[in-house]
């Protein structure tokens, strides 16, 4: 049986084998490839059937092209035209065949190219020239002119400094306008917009070449540009860690403030709730009672509001009894004071939650803030005890003075007086950033005071000057001897600062008008320096914020990948089965997150994940190799194709018809 079947197998192979190569009929007119490649053919005298003369081939090609494209060739005439109803001897079959040509087609004029009329001197179209006409040229071909082209746009398209463009230029289909193109001009090349998502639409060709159905490119939020000004003079190839992330100290500061805001105190003896506030946490570092400033012991707590969920600072005056209801209403005027150098007052009320009669003031909470006394006075005494005190730099003192002057300007403009300008009640909320605190308390505690507002405002100026002298001497008790304090201040600082402080200390004198506006006019040069520093800080914060712009884009990409991959409800749906683009999206997920090393251990590389997702987000042309889990399929795709597949799959998932399944 085996021997019998073998000839049949040979016959089948012989029957399906390649046929014998026959000699080409036009081989003599075809140039030998060896002549083209090597310049000679060693088989020329050994039976090579191809032509070995290049000049002969070119001449034959030109003659052939003249035969095919000669415009003076005889006009086309239908073969049945001569016998259409004119031959009496035509057979019935021929007559039936001739009836298929309509009389209008039979009487049509013979075809003649339009260019013959323009190049012929004869008066009749049927007369031909005996001279040899040249071949066709591109300029003689009638150009295609679309309807709806605007000639007014030629100036903008040709405005490249090269002069007008002749009509022999080819038509550019990527420009659309509203009126027909004039005969005297054509369209020049248009530079594409590299930032446009739809290139055809950007060049104006959407009307002629409608784009294929696909996903719509999202906003280019991955195109980041460094926002100036740039304070560091680095070379183009040099990089700093601050170019990629927030400055480390700034990030740590924000994280610490967030942790301090959310801090709780378990097993506390404090009340669980005070009015509409709960979760009280004490903020005082000194647990000794001190009634020097307000006349009552005061305590500060952090609490969360049940109304809006925000955190506030509660200042409690222990043992205060409200005798006049109008006193607490004076806080309403302080609610209208909105200034960056004043801690905003929100509310004031009495409470017995601490088992006594207490007065509670509600103000803004600034986490991890210090007082000027803690920053400069207390730290100076502990650290430099027995040494010469270190003076605060003069520029920092000027910054403090301009901010306090700004606060007093807002307070005095509302017909109020701060009344409390003390180093222990001024908060340092940032780098050289201070705010006046506890200003409204004295208006309630000393409501029955007979002093006028003008007198209290003058006293604010005196307290202001004493504060600067205290900070300059770096000692809280220096004002017990004012003469010695000013001598010490004069030796350490400039005459301008000394004269400004001396003017403030004499604020109670009646010899001349003294108010905060006059003081601000006197320190206007320092105000400009502080304002310039604030502008630099604003630029720095804007630059830092720009690096965090759209920092959730990688999360969106991972969310889309998980939405598309391995959906169990569409497992048997042919339109949604994991084939095609959805299949290599699944493999791409393994490529990003499920890689293993040579030993088969999982590779946990955050840099690889971020790099792949960034390239996917940008849609780069870089190609990667994706291999299936069974190692039977291999794909070579680019990130651009992956991005398009992801967007189209996600858009298909969002269709209403898909959601109805």
Swiss-Prot record:
State the Pfam families in the record.
Pan3_PK
Location of region: Disordered: 1-26, 53-130
Q: Where is this region: Knob domain?
A: 564-661
Q: Supply the alphabetized keyword list.
A: ATP-binding, Coiled coil, Cytoplasm, Metal-binding, mRNA processing, Nucleotide-binding, Zinc, Zinc-finger
- ZnF (C3H1-type) spans are 26-55
The ranges of region (Pseudokinase domain) come to: 263-524
Question: What start-end ranges are recorded for coiled-coil regions in this protein?
Answer: 525-563
Where is this gene product found? Cytoplasm
Q: Which GO terms describe its biological process?
A: mRNA processing; nuclear-transcribed mRNA poly(A) tail shortening
The positions annotated for binding ATP are 315, 364-371, 424-425
Compositionally biased residues, Low complexity = 75-102
The superkingdom listed in its UniProt entry is: Eukaryota
- List where Polar residues composition bias occurs: 115-130
Q: Which InterPro entries match?
A: Kinase-like_dom_sf, PAN3, Pan3_PK, Prot_kinase_dom, Znf_CCCH
Q: Name one GO cellular component term.
A: P-body
**Which Gene Ontology molecular function entries are recorded, alphabetically?**
ATP binding; poly(A) binding; protein kinase activity; zinc ion binding
Entry text on domains: The N-terminal zinc finger binds to poly(A) RNA. Contains a pseudokinase domain. The protein kinase domain is predicted to be catalytically inactive because some of the residues important for catalytic activity are substituted and it lacks the equivalent of the binding site for a peptide substrate. However, it has retained an ATP-binding site and ATP-binding is required for mRNA degradation, stimulating the activity of the pan2 nuclease in vitro.
| Quaternary structure and partners | Homodimer. Forms a heterotrimer with a catalytic subunit pan2 to form the poly(A)-nuclease (PAN) deadenylation complex. Interacts (via PAM-2 motif) with poly(A)-binding protein pab1 (via PABC domain), conferring substrate specificity of the enzyme complex.
The similarity annotation says:
Belongs to the protein kinase superfamily. PAN3 family.
Q: PANTHER family attached here? A: DEADENYLATION COMPLEX SUBUNIT PAN3, PAN2-PAN3 DEADENYLATION COMPLEX SUBUNIT PAN3
Q: Tell me, what does this protein do in biology?
A: Regulatory subunit of the poly(A)-nuclease (PAN) deadenylation complex, one of two cytoplasmic mRNA deadenylases involved in mRNA turnover. PAN specifically shortens poly(A) tails of RNA and the activity is stimulated by poly(A)-binding protein pab1. PAN deadenylation is followed by rapid degradation of the shortened mRNA tails by the CCR4-NOT complex. Deadenylated mRNAs are then degraded by two alternative mechanisms, namely exosome-mediated 3'-5' exonucleolytic degradation, or deadenylation-dependent mRNA decaping and subsequent 5'-3' exonucleolytic degradation by xrn1.
| Name of the protein this chain belongs to | PAN2-PAN3 deadenylation complex subunit PAN3
Species for this entry: Neosartorya fischeri (strain ATCC 1020 / DSM 3700 / CBS 544.65 / FGSC A1164 / JCM 1740 / NRRL 181 / WB 181) (Aspergillus fischerianus)
Q: What is the lineage of its organism?
A: Eukaryota, Fungi, Dikarya, Ascomycota, Pezizomycotina
Which gene is transcribed and translated to give this protein? pan3
